[in-house]
């Protein structure tokens, strides 16, 4: 009974043609919004440890990294030192680092799925990106608890991706970086 105008038809065709891009943008916006919701939450870990470690790293400057501060490895402490140079409070700085790596993790995992998929590669990659970014554990870990697990996990995924692409040197560089950030990486090494 109703017929579309030429303009409406063009809009519908445009949406159909770019639906995956719209999905990607929508998921990214939702993921950012969900992370903003957790930015002001102060976990017990932050109040008991991370905040005081920030103060020590900031006070001692770069040379202070010669001594162990807290129980994180030096690569993470270097990142935190660099964040102390920015006009940010400790809570936001820790969370921003982790949130950035949430996106690195989502992108690298999507790339891994894309490289393995035989059909519907773009759709599967975008769904993977979405699943990682909208996972409650990933959201809470970074934006609520200020934890850094997405950092070493991103490098593990990149190691697997490059191994799959038959680039063993790059793979082992990424697994080495992951190991430098967190010793739990040892559990993935037998798989490689």
Residue spans for each PLM region:
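Transmembrane-helix motifs of polytopic, lipid-linked glycan transferases
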Residues: 96-119
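Transmembrane signal-anchor helices characteristic of membrane glycosylation enzymes that use polyprenol
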Residues: 14-49, 99-102, 130, 134-140
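Multi-pass, polyprenyl lipid-linked donor-dependent membrane glycosyltransferases
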Residues: 97-100, 130-134, 138-157, 181, ...
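Short hydrophobic alpha-helices at membrane interfaces in multi-pass membrane enzymes
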Residues: 124-125, 162-177
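Transmembrane and membrane-interface helices of multi-pass
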Residues: 113-117, 125-138, 160
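Specific aromatic-rich, kink-prone transmembrane helix
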Residues: 108-111, 151-168
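Extracytoplasmic catalytic/substrate-binding loops of multi-pass membrane glycan-assembly enzymes
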Residues: 38-53, 67-79, 92
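Perimembrane helix-loop-helix junctions
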Residues: 4-6, 188-192
């Amino acid at each position: 009974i109703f017929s579309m105008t030429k303009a409406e038809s063009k809009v519908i065709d445009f949406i159909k043609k770019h639906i995956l891009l719209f999905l990607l943008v929508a998921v990214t916006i939702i993921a950012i919004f969900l992370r903003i919701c957790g930015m002001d939450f102060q976990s017990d870990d932050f109040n008991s440890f991370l905040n005081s470690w920030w103060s020590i790293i900031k006070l001692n400057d770069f040379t202070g990294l010669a001594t162990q501060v807290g129980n994180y490895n030096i690569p993470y402490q270097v990142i935190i030192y660099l964040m102390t140079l920015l006009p940010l409070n400790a809570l936001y700085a820790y969370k921003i680092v982790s949130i950035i790596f949430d996106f690195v993790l989502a992108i690298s995992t999507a790339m891994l799925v894309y490289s393995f998929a035989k059909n519907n590669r773009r759709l599967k990659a975008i769904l993977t990106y979405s699943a990682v970014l909208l996972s409650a554990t990933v959201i809470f870990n970074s934006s609520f608890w200020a934890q850094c697990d997405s950092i070493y996990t991103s490098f593990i995924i990149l190691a697997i991706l490059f191994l799959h692409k038959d680039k063993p040197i790059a793979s082992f560089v990424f697994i080495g970086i992951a190991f430098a950030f967190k010793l739990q990486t040892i559990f993935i090494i037998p798989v490689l």
